[in-house]
């Protein structure tokens, strides 16, 4: 989702063809959706479907039939490349119903990059002693070029350009015109492309390892859940529970979009798909176009920090840090709940301020009927959580939850999956994974260069210099780096690049590995709602018909807690519920923080988040004047800052302001009675 150089324009979705309008919005703000269109009766569609289904089956098969990592990952990248050259046009305005001859050549060459490693594997690993021959170098160059071209088609120009900058460094790293700290030894083609192609520290790095073993399977799991109708369940149950309440449709959007965003991890696509249902309802009861689009964007983006599935970067975090994914998911729970509490409370206070009522109960589905019809679709998610907490390997857990989804969906006729549905889910999952596969492969180029040279150490020392010995300043500059990269790059490379540079710098201040990586993880994701480049918000504006930039700033306001929470868990790690000091690498245990600390800090954070939301909206029980808003904002920040003194001051001021506001509300109601 990195086609950042777009000129946001609203699209009217209230015409006769809303599906076409939504597709136009999606293609405008989500580069990944600009694919070729094949008639299902044509041979090309069958070829793509067969390759995609085989690709998914391969990932299921290797969970129980492991092969050497280099071979496993090379096949993962090669088939992903092959599918990209079939599905994505060379240029966006190119004829999308045909595949040009050169893409068939690229298709074949993509397979060749993996076939070569499989055929030459023994010689590469044992006979050559790590020294590549000319053929190794040639195929390595071919693989890198194919990856860069595929990335250009899927994500746009920015990611390949960043990779090329890193790739150029070892060619010039010995030259005197570079700053002294960047000068290192000379590298030849064998050094560079041997590192990138023949080792698991380049194209086939830990990022691709996470992609093949974790991310692909969870994307596939999401495809099966979508096919079973779980999205409809989330919409219906949210409507049944919250639709009739004050500002109901907006609360429905937050809940349903959050859960769906957690499953599919695609913020822009989720805004368009879920927003096409929730945004018209929000507008109908009186929310403005800009606010409606912003609510959908904030909720969809937050799904990537919401357990149990979260965004793809969380799996990269598990692979990079060696920490069990279940531990990471548990640690992410409280911060995610705090974030969604902030969004829901702002929605609630906006509704109170403008007297926006919910939908009549008679027009809403009933909870009992929704649970009876589709409630069983929650079972696979419960199974997944159970398997993760039983320390089952993540890939195996994903496999069994996919099987569980098919079995559970068969419980009712309305959700039962036919053979055709299963094949479509296999194909859909493969296609949806391509953007992640190519992003991880390009990240591998960056990781390979950093591993080969001293570039990572240089960047770490640069961040330390900027921080000037201050943890807060180091965190601040890390946040800026994450957000700037997140505006121009997909979340995976933004996370990897920033974590590579910043995590060691934060470690110098005693920040535990898990906490440092979670900090970086958050800001790379919330760049999607940060103007001037806020693609999720722009997509929300497209669906709502609002002003893209106004919607972007409104989404930023709604998501403000997401920019505060990472600082909170750095200074008070008990908000992660995990004791990071007792967390070893390859940890499979769940060393909980002190329960008293968890309860105290979570409680004060909840009060602070509610107060922050009231201050931002200028409303609690009734309107808040400017002075009370500013005092409440300051008190909210005091209450969430770790420390007993700050908690007492913040909570006391909040209590006084809420009492004043409550009494004002009673007085106003008495006067109008």
Model-derived features with residue positions:
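Conserved, well-structured core domains of diverse proteins
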Residues: 1-130, 137-141
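Membrane-water interface regions at transmembrane-helix termini and the short interhelical loops
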Residues: 37, 62-66, 88-99, 123-124, ...
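Structural signature of hydrophobic alpha-helical transmembrane segments
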Residues: 70-81, 128-140, 331-338, 398, ...
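Membrane-interfacial loop-to-helix junctions in multi-pass transporters
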Residues: 134-138, 201-214, 241-253, 285-291, ...
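Transmembrane alpha-helix interface/packing and boundary motifs in multi-pass membrane proteins
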Residues: 222-226, 257-266, 298-304, 388, ...
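Hydrophobic transmembrane alpha-helices that form the pore/transport pathway of multi-pass ion
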Residues: 235-303, 309, 313, 322, ...
């Amino acid at each position: 989702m990195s086609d950042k150089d777009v000129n946001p324009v609203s699209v009217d979705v209230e015409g006769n063809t809303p599906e076409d309008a939504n597709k136009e919005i999606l293609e405008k703000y989500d580069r990944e959706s600009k694919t070729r269109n094949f008639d299902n009766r044509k041979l090309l569609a069958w070829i793509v479907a067969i390759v995609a289904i085989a690709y998914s089956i391969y990932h299921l098969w290797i969970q129980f039939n492991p092969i050497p990592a280099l071979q496993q990952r090379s096949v993962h990248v090669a088939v992903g490349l092959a599918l990209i050259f079939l599905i994505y046009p060379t240029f966006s305005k190119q004829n999308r119903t045909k595949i040009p001859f050169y893409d068939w050549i690229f298709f074949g060459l993509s397979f060749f990059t993996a076939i070569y490693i499989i055929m030459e594997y023994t010689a590469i690993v044992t006979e050559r002693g790590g020294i590549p021959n000319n053929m190794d170098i040639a195929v390595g160059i071919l693989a890198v070029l194919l990856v860069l071209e595929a990335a250009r088609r899927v994500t746009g120009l920015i990611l390949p350009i960043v990779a090329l900058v890193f790739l150029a460094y070892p060619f010039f790293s010995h030259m005197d015109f570079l700053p002294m700290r960047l000068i290192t030894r000379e590298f030849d083609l064998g050094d560079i492309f041997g590192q990138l192609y023949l080792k698991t520290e380049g194209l086939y790095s830990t990022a691709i390892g996470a992609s093949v073993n974790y991310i692909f399977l969870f994307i596939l799991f999401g495809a099966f859940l979508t096919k079973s109708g779980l999205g409809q369940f989330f919409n219906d149950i949210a409507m049944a529970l919250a639709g009739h309440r004050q500002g109901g449709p907006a609360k429905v959007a937050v809940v349903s979009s959050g859960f769906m965003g957690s499953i599919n991890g695609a913020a822009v696509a989720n805004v368009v798909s879920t927003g096409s249902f929730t945004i018209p309802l929000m507008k109908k009861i009186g929310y403005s176009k800009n606010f409606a689009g912003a609510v959908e964007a904030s909720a969809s983006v937050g799904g990537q920090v919401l357990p149990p599935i979260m965004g793809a970067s969380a799996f990269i975090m598990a692979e990079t840090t060696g920490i069990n994914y279940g531990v990471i998911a548990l640690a992410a729970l409280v911060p995610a709940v705090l974030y969604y509490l902030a969004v829901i409370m702002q929605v609630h206070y906006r509704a109170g301020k403008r007297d926006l009522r919910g939908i009549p109960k008679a027009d809403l589905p009933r909870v009992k009927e929704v649970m009876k019809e589709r409630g069983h679709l929650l079972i696979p998610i419960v199974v997944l959580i159970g398997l993760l907490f039983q320390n089952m390997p993540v890939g195996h857990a994903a496999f069994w939850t996919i099987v569980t989804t098919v079995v559970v969906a068969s419980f009712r006729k309305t959700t039962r999956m036919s053979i055709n549905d299963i094949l479509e889910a296999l194909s859909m999952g493969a296609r949806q994974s391509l953007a992640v596969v190519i992003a991880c492969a390009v990240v591998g180029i960056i990781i390979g260069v950093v591993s080969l040279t001293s570039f990572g150490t240089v960047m770490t020392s640069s961040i330390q210099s900027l921080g000037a010995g201050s943890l807060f300043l180091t965190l601040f500059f890390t946040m800026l780096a994450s957000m700037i990269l997140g505006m121009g790059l997909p979340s995976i490379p933004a996370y990897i690049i920033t974590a590579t540079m910043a995590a060691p710098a934060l470690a110098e201040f005693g920040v535990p590995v898990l906490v440092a990586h979670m900090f970086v993880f958050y800001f790379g994701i919330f760049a999607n709602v940060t103007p001037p480049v806020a693609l999720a918000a722009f997509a929300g504006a497209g669906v709502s018909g609002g002003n893209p930039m106004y919607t972007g700033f409104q989404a930023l306001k709604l998501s403000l807690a997401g920019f505060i929470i990472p600082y909170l868990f750095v200074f008070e790690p008990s908000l992660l519920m995990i004791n990071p000091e007792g967390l070893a690498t390859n940890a499979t245990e769940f060393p909980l923080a002190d329960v008293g600390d968890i309860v105290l800090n979570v409680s004060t954070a909840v009060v602070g988040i509610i107060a922050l939301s009231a201050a931002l909206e200028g409303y609690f029980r009734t309107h808040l004047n400017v002075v009370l808003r500013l005092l409440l904002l300051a008190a909210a920040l005091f209450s969430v800052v770790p420390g007993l003194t700050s908690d007492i001051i913040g909570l006391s001021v909040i209590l006084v302001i809420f009492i004043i506001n409550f009494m004002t509300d009673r007085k106003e109601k008495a006067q109008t009675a």
